[in-house]
């Protein structure tokens, strides 16, 4: 959307305010922003070694490197998650709307802080059908200036309700199933003492992160907010196509 906006394609009023000549008015450019927000509850475990201690240790990292060099196996061959699953937040839904990703590590800020000093796992949960919508808008006519991105995560009651249900499903699996009893799981974050839905979502959102799935800001379809047609051609223009994830309506 930024390329279109600086080129004069988008919301006419906003672009004129930035001194940009209007080539084509297209209200939907930069609107309808959607993303998958990942909640990252953390559980302490016993009788099971997570990767925390190995990653926090210089010697452990050395062993990880050697395993990869000589065996092409181990943590350096792993993907972002080792377990994935889908469930419904409510049985009445036609299809699953929650996705789990499980990692044998735990940390406060993924990629920006050390692993915890205990054995822990992170069973993340994300609403894959969010109803919240954000927007992205340029701040100047200079392509070197970053746009303003407003995600509006959890701005609808439905998204907050689904988030609470997802976190409670994770809690039930971790704390109430026979499978995990031998590992004596303890909810480190957000904390089993938090039972109110709104409080649970608020606490968990402090450690939530994007899964980097933004779509929708040049959506395909008909109507005022649609930017491209089913051939990816921009409405109102000739021979201009948008070919990336922004064309996905949802």
What is each of the regions a protein language model found here?
Residues 41, 45-50, 59-250:
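FAD-dependent oxidoreductase catalytic-site/capping-region signature
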Residues 1-67:
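Glycine-rich loop(s) and the adjacent beta-strand/alpha-helix scaffold that form part
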């Amino acid at each position: 959307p930024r390329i279109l906006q600086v080129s004069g394609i988008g919301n006419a009023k906003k672009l004129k305010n930035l001194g940009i000549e209007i080539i084509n008015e297209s209200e939907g450019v930069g609107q309808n922003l959607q993303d998958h927000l990942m909640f990252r509850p953390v559980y302490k475990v016993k009788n099971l070694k997570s990767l925390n201690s190995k990653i926090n240790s210089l010697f452990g990292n050395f062993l990880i490197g050697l395993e990869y060099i000589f065996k092409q196996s181990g943590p350096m061959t792993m993907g972002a998650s080792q377990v994935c699953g889908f469930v419904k937040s409510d049985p009445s839904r036609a299809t699953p709307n929650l996705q789990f990703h499980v990692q044998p590590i735990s940390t406060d800020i993924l990629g920006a802080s050390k692993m915890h000093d205990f054995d822990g796992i992170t069973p993340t949960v994300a609403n894959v059908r969010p109803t919240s919508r954000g927007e992205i808008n340029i701040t100047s006519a200079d392509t070197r200036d970053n746009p303003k991105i407003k995600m509006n995560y959890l701005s609808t009651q439905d998204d907050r309700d689904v988030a609470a249900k997802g976190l409670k499903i994770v809690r039930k699996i971790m704390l109430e199933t026979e499978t995990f009893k031998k590992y004596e799981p303890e909810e480190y974050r957000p904390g089993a003492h938090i039972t109110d839905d709104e409080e649970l979502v608020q606490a968990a959102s402090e450690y939530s992160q994007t899964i980097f799935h933004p779509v929708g800001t040049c959506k395909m379809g008909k109507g005022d907010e649609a930017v491209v047609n089913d051939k990816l051609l921009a409405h109102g223009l000739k021979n201009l196509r948008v070919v990336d994830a922004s064309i996905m309506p949802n």
